[in-house]
Amino acid sequence: MKVLFVTRGFPSEREIMVGNYEAVQAKALAAKGLDVSVMAMRWKPTRYLFFNNRISHREVDGIDIYEFIYVSVSERFRFLRRFCSPMSHGFRKTFNKYLKEKGLPDIVHAHIVLYAYNTLFLKTEYNLPFVITEHWTLMNTGNVSKEVEEMSIAYRFADRVICVSQALADSLKNNFQINSIVIHNMVSDSFFKSARILSNDNHFTFIAIGAFRKNKGFDILIDAFANGRFPENVCLNIVGDGEERELVESKIRKYQLSNQVKLLGTKSPDEVNDLLCHSDCFVLSSRLETFAIVVIEAMAKGLPVIATRSGGPETFLQHEHGILVDKENVKELSDAMKYMVLHYTDYNSKQIRKYCYDHFSQDVIANQIVCVYKEVLSRNK
């Protein structure tokens, strides 16, 4: 079976996290014997507008990656926008290169409605079976722009729409009257290769991972940690970066927590793996999620989890794996963190890892996706 992924990008040495979720899924399907290629778009700044080589081809672990540069012209250089081609034009030219080298795919699998909309020509002109996986947090807000609402027509052309959580599926049903099925995110096999290392000393380490954006709730997390009045042997490591870093730093200074709360910046998957192994509890303080893949990455290590009811974790996190709290509730989050420091040894790491593997491993989720492909292809004969 020849599958063409349509994505926001694919990881590279320079951009290690771009399209990482889609890359893990593509590799899992390739491991099942499918011929998987990826057609990806790379956002680039204005200086790339007149860059000649806008389409590239590379191979990663047996997967052909066809990428094109899409230039995002800033307001400062808006006079140059007349030289920009539509995103769909870039995808069309990239597909022509793929078509010349590999022929027509059996099925197209687009990730998020933005890229599905800009590759609808694959359905309308080539009549290719078309699957969409939605995991865009924006689609779980109930407050989408008119432009995004127009893009939602792509759902109606799809042979099957997949959502990564029930909350997101409900949102698509309520906002766009779209029926979908739920197939959760998968966790990379690399997270199962090593387990959490229990510390012999008296230190306790919380870890949180994510982009520094408002919806991730790191401001709430710092407030909760400060409210807990933890002794010096309890610390919090935060992995990530972004627009709200200064706000988080100001709160750390305000509460005089610089000795206990560390901002570690962006880390590679291997570095995240190692940090999780040397942590005692994962904390998700998000205001909004579609699933929260970082939670299952932590569970793959055997870590107990504290997570907010933010649209994803409440659908799979069970009481024997951790604690669910209401979002934006500083006291409830703080109380959960204090409880975890005292009772984290009550959680069975082996049981958490097994639950995670049985429900979210590459093998399990890839099998579910292959079943969707077969069902769609049988209807398109």
Model-derived regions, located:
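N-terminal subdomain of nucleotide-sugar transferases
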Residues: M1-D61, K374, K381
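Conserved donor-binding/catalytic core segment of Leloir-type glycosyltransferases
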Residues: L4, S199-K216, I222-F225, N237
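Short His-centered aromatic/hydrophobic patch
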Residues: A110-Y115
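Carbohydrate-associated surface elements
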Residues: A167, M186
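Short alpha-helical donor nucleotide-sugar binding micro-motif in glycosyltransferases
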Residues: T266-K267, D274-S279
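Aromatic "clamp/platform" in nucleotide-sugar-dependent glycosyltransferases that forms part
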Residues: R287
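Short hydrophobic beta-strand element within catalytic cores of glycosyltransferases
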Residues: P304-A307
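Conserved acidic donor-binding segment of nucleotide-sugar-dependent glycosyltransferases
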Residues: H319, I323-V330, Y339-T345
